[in-house]
Each structure stands twice: as structure tokens, then as C-alpha cells.
UniProtKB/Swiss-Prot annotation:
Entries under InterPro entries matching the protein: Interferon-induced_GILT
Lineage, top ranks: Eukaryota, Metazoa, Chordata, Craniata, Vertebrata
Gene Ontology CC: cell junction; cytosol; extracellular region; lysosome
GO biological process: antigen processing and presentation of exogenous peptide antigen via MHC class I; antigen processing and presentation of exogenous peptide antigen via MHC class II; negative regulation of fibroblast proliferation; protein stabilization
Gene coding for it: Ifi30
Entry EC no(s): 1.8.-.-
Protein name: Gamma-interferon-inducible lysosomal thiol reductase
Secreted among keywords: yes
Keywords annotated in UniProt: Disulfide bond, Glycoprotein, Immunity, Lysosome, Oxidoreductase, Redox-active center, Secreted, Signal
Other remarks on this protein: Both precursor form and mature form have thiol reductase activity.
Maturation-removed propeptide residues: 25-54, 231-248
Paired cysteines (S-S): 69-72
Any GO molecular function: oxidoreductase activity, acting on a sulfur group of donors
Record's subunit section: Dimer; disulfide-linked.
Length: 248
């Protein structure tokens, strides 16, 4: 994929900093959460506070992918991320960076061969370590930030600085190049190999454990499958969307 500069990503990122973000694009605080309100100051990025209690379980969206796959990067940045912005309060995202890689046990050590070469294996481990070491939403946003960039490895530091400045890129790279990175990749290999039905390609997307054949339908699928009494506003507007054809 020919990736664009930071500008397109920033157009989406600006949504996170708007003083009055639409309800469908925010993490709502439960009533009486004075502690969260006190600690979340006006200049902070307050996406990681407690959310309101849901009247039904969130919709589970799982993405099985590999870090340098063009189609995976497109789905992550252009489909999954915008959907999360709009309906984050009713969806739960799981990322599994491994994809079409292969593993083998060599003298008791797991070695990996990745579809797009050694760099992809390294970046898969980096993203696995982000998911292992950071809070879930911070890891997701950092990975989206990296996947938007041309040189993902060099952008690890700036993306961490944007969302979790207290975490150093050196600590993530230490994980990725060490024993923990190998363990995480092996775990992701097992998760990927256990898929039923097996994945046919990447990105392989599951919505409530069922494959999503049309990535463009992610938002509508999440809205449809959520069984709660209150849905984000965007779900109501989608229900009133015009037909694709006009009958005579």
C-alpha cells in the first residue's frame, strides 16, 4: 500500500480533540463518576476514562492481520479506526498481529517466517508488545498511528509520545527483540491457527466470532448486532439511510 503522510491521519485524529465531540464518538462517563471528571482536565485526551454501563454486552470485533500487509493497513486505518471513533462504547476490539506468517520450533526456540519479510516479523512483535504492555485503547491508537506511516519502526517513538509519553520506545523494542516478543508471536500463531473456519486471507475480520466478508459493512454490522436498548446516534442515522436504487 502506498501510504499517505500524516495529514490524512490527523484529519481523523482531530476528532479526538474537538471540545464537543458527538455522543457516538466519545467514551461516555457513567453518572456520578466525579473521580474521572476530576482527573481528566480540559487539555487532556480523555478517551481512557470509565464508560457508562451497557445494557448488553459489547460487540466483539477481532482483526487477524500482519503489520506490512497493504490491505490490513487500509482496513485498520480507514475502516476499523473510524468505526471505533463512532461506536467505541458498544464495541470491543481484539488485534492479533501474525497473519500469514509461519512458525517452526528450532532446538526449542520458535522461529518465524513472515509474508513480507523479516521487517514484518519484527513489526508484528512490536505491535504484539504494545498490546501486551499498554492499556488496550492506548495500544490500539498507537498501532493505528504507526500503520498510517511510511516508516513504521521510526514512528514508534512519535506515536508513543502522542498517546503514552511515559512509555519509551526502547522498552517496547526490548520486548519485541527479546524472549517476550517471541512468546507473544507464538501465542498469536496459536490463536490464528485455531481459527474455525481457518482464515483464507488477511485482513481476516470476525464480528462476534463470525467472519465479516465485506469490510465496508463493519459499522452497520456492529450497530445491528448490539442488543442494548441505547445505541450510538450514528446507528439510528444508518437505519434511515437511502436505498441504493430508486424504483419507478
Amino acid at each position: 500500500m502506498s501510504c499517505s503522510p500524516l495529514v490524512p491521519f490527523l484529519s481523523l485524529l482531530l476528532l479526538l480533540f474537538l471540545p464537543e465531540v458527538p455522543r457516538a464518538a466519545t467514551a461516555s462517563l457513567p453518572q456520578g463518576s466525579s473521580e474521572g471528571a476530576a482527573t481528566c482536565k480540559a487539555h487532556d485526551l480523555c478517551l481512557f476514562g470509565p464508560r457508562r454501563l451497557l445494557s448488553a454486552p459489547p460487540v466483539n470485533v477481532s482483526l487477524y492481520y500482519e503489520s506490512l500487509c497493504g490491505a490490513c493497513r487500509y482496513f485498520l486505518v480507514r475502516n476499523l479506526f473510524p468505526t471505533w471513533l463512532m461506536v467505541m462504547e458498544i464495541m470491543n476490539i481484539t488485534l492479533v498481529p501474525y497473519g500469514n506468517a509461519q512458525e517452526r520450533n528450532v532446538s526449542g526456540t520458535w522461529e518465524f517466517t513472515c509474508q513480507h519479510g523479516e521487517l514484518e516479523c519484527k513489526l508484528n512483535k512490536v505491535e504484539a508488545c504494545l498490546l501486551d504492555k499498554l492499556e488496550k485503547e492506548a495500544a490500539f491508537l498507537t498501532i493505528v498511528c504507526m500503520e498510517e506511516m511510511e516508516d513504521m519502526e521510526k514512528k514508534l517513538g512519535p506515536c508513543l509520545q502522542l498517546y503514552v509519553p511515559e512509555v519509551s520506545p526502547e522498552s517496547i523494542m526490548e520486548c519485541a527483540t527479546g524472549k517476550r516478543g517471541t512468546e507473544l508471536m507464538h501465542e498469536n500463531a496459536q490463536l490464528t491457527d485455531a481459527l474455525q473456519p481457518p482464515h483464507e486471507y488477511v485482513p481476516w475480520v470476525l464480528v462476534n466470532e463470525k467472519p465479516l466478508t465485506d469490510p465496508s459493512q463493519l459499522l452497520s454490522s456492529v450497530c445491528e448486532l448490539y442488543q442494548g436498548t441505547e445505541k450510538p446516534d450514528i446507528c439510528s442515522s444508518m437505519a434511515d439511510a437511502p436505498r441504493e436504487v430508486c424504483y419507478k
